[in-house]
Amino acid sequence: MNVLSLFDGISCARVALDRANLKVDIYYASEIDKYAVAISKKNYPDITQLGDITKLRFEINQDKDSNLYSENMVGVGKFDIDLLIGGSPCQDLSIAKKNREGLHGKRSSLFYEFVRLRDELKPRFFILENVNSMSKENKQIITDVLGVEPIMINAALVSAQQRKRLFWIGRLVNDKYETVKINLPDDKGILLKDILEENVDEKYYI
């Protein structure tokens, strides 16, 4: 499976795919934070780092004489994506920010870069994640633009953290995206005391 992870951070999506026993052939990552990229490179040296999402360009080269064409990501070469994943910045969407600008904000408007690349690359599947606490208006805009319905999953079902997030999951069918419906995970009942370690190496302290 070929994966493109946008707003990749420290490549937690790669960790999740590995834990799900999904074979990853090629993993491309778009991330601009140098510290996050450094961690990703240390843990997964095989990941291809593409840099700033706003500078990623996809093009089709067509040979008019032979009707052959090739799909390329500028600077990378042939590009065939099975899964596009990403969680666009939420600072302008979350209720944690008082004067939030919604999808017009400088950071949260990067959602439209996700959409641009999805429409250019036509991946077989895509997953977009964002905060559940956004306004109904912004939630509906994202839903309408992506063309699929979201599902809300609380990380508390599988971890010791209350973290409600929306996931829009789409599958390409006849050149259009359809909603992929999934079941909520079972509640594992994990508490903070279940994951805290008593003896931790000092190198992990700041």
Protein language model features and the residues they cover:
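A structural micro-motif
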Residues: 1, 24-25, 46-47, 123-124, ...
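SAM cofactor-binding core of SAM-dependent methyltransferases
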Residues: 3-57
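Class I S-adenosyl-L-methionine
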Residues: 59-83, 88-206
